[in-house]
Design a protein with these regions (language model features):
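Cleavable N-terminal export/targeting peptides
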Residues: 1-30
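Short glycine/proline- and aromatic-enriched beta-strand/turn motifs that initiate or cap beta-hairpins
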Residues: 21-75, 182-189
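Residues that define the transmembrane beta-barrel architecture of outer-membrane proteins
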Residues: 31, 47-53, 92-98, 134-140, ...
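Predominantly the C-terminal beta-signal and adjacent terminal strand-loop region
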Residues: 32, 145-189
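Flexible, solvent-exposed coil segments and beta strand-coil junctions
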Residues: 32-39, 79-83, 120-126, 161-166
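Membrane-embedded beta-strand positions of outer-membrane beta-barrel proteins
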Residues: 33-39, 69-73, 100, 116-120, ...
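Extracellular loop and loop/strand-boundary signature of outer-membrane beta-barrel proteins
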Residues: 42-43, 84-90, 126-132, 167-172
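Gram-negative (and chloroplast) outer-membrane scaffold detector with strong preference
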Residues: 51-128, 186
């Protein structure tokens, strides 16, 4: 267990060093902020009843060939329970971690745009989550979004997201799926 923890801490340290050693131009060019708030309800897994309340804050980092690449942070508050082995176990926690998103956007008409988003977050939880899991994990999201650009610098969006959360390990990996609506606001400076 100590070896796994030391490897985990080493990987996090190397990621932080890599991010902060980037040339300033790489992370100083973003001139916008996007906030997404969502409620995702549990689905698919029969023994995992966990709902997610998420806040994502993104900045556009790069644009290429119709795709935009974003970096940000995710705060999540999953709540619920699991019933593995017919034993009810509470699965409430708070998670925080870095996120990245890829968005493909196409105009529909006038100020209305259609988007397809894929994002991933690496989260550190306040305790082992879900029950019998680990205190860290990943959250993957995919879904369509409609964006209304009501001014040159502001837009409002509504999306429907599918989310998969797990820690990616073969053992102690009680992952769960959820679906739900996401509301977003973007402001360009």
């Amino acid at each position: 267990m100590k070896r796994k923890l030391s490897v985990f801490v080493s990987v996090i340290f190397l990621l932080v060093v890599a991010v902060f050693s980037l040339p300033q131009g790489c992370y100083a060019m973003a001139k916008n902020a996007e906030v997404q708030v969502e409620y995702l309800r549990h689905r698919i897994y029969a023994r995992r009843f966990i709902d997610n309340y998420n806040i994502h804050v993104f900045q556009k980092a790069h644009e290429h060939a119709g795709l935009t690449f974003h970096r940000g942070i995710t705060v999540t508050r999953p709540r619920g329970y699991t019933t593995e082995d017919n034993i009810r176990r509470d699965s409430d926690a708070v998670g925080l971690g870095p996120a990245c998103m890829i968005r493909w956007e196409r105009p529909i008409s006038g100020k209305l745009y259609g988007d397809l988003e894929f994002s991933g977050s690496f989260l550190i939880y306040s305790k082992a989550f879900p029950a019998q899991g680990r205190p860290w994990g990943f959250m993957w999201r995919l879904g369509p979004r409609l964006t209304w650009k009501y001014t040159k610098n502001n837009s409002f969006s509504l999306g429907y997201m599918f989310s998969h959360s797990s820690n990616g390990m073969r053992t102690n990996n009680p992952g769960h799926h959820s679906f739900g609506f996401s509301i977003g606001f973007n402001h360009n400076f």
